[in-house]
Amino acid sequence: MKNLRSQIPFILIFNFFSSGCHTLLDTDRNLLIQQADHLEKKGRYYWERRINPDHAKKAQIFLSIAYELKPEADNLAILYSQACYFNGLYIEQIPEKKDSLFLEGYHIAKGIVYHSKSFQKGFNAVEDNNLIRELRGIEALEKSFVPALYWWVANLGRYLINKPVVE
């Protein structure tokens, strides 16, 4: 599993250098999009079979790599955030790794919400402190972003649940 994830960057680097070190052309972008689509498809395939812990882990790996290639795809990002939550809650046993998964899912989902136009409109409408601005942004959020908002809060809640109130 780790071998697969560690090989992907080397393959991409090899492709870059073997192609003459030129900048991305339209054909290169199309190839990256095709690779991302294939990785997303594999991630969804394993996600549908997440009853098997190995499949849940593979789904998260494929979805994370696809997300790195296509960070603007909100549905992919939401699924990746959900996979982080699932693996952190049900699969992973080591507390530090659980926290890492919950934080990853939190940051992904929060990024979706923060980059939405409706959130930004509400967020920038007031000049108060950041908490009030954030609440205004959430109030202005379109209904289509509710799943991202849910996974933002679910991942953050699971991360914070075992943390001390005062250190």
Residue positions per predicted region:
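Bacterial N-terminal signal peptides that target proteins for export
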Residues: M1-I8
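Bacterial N-terminal signal peptides
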Residues: P9-S19
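Bacterial Sec signal peptide processing site at the extreme N-terminus
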Residues: C21-A36
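Short coil/linker segments at helix-helix boundaries
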Residues: Q34-I61, Y80-E167
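Surface-exposed, polar/charged faces of alpha-helical domains
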Residues: I61, E68-E72
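Short helix-capping/linker turns of helical repeat alpha-solenoids
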Residues: E72-A73, S144
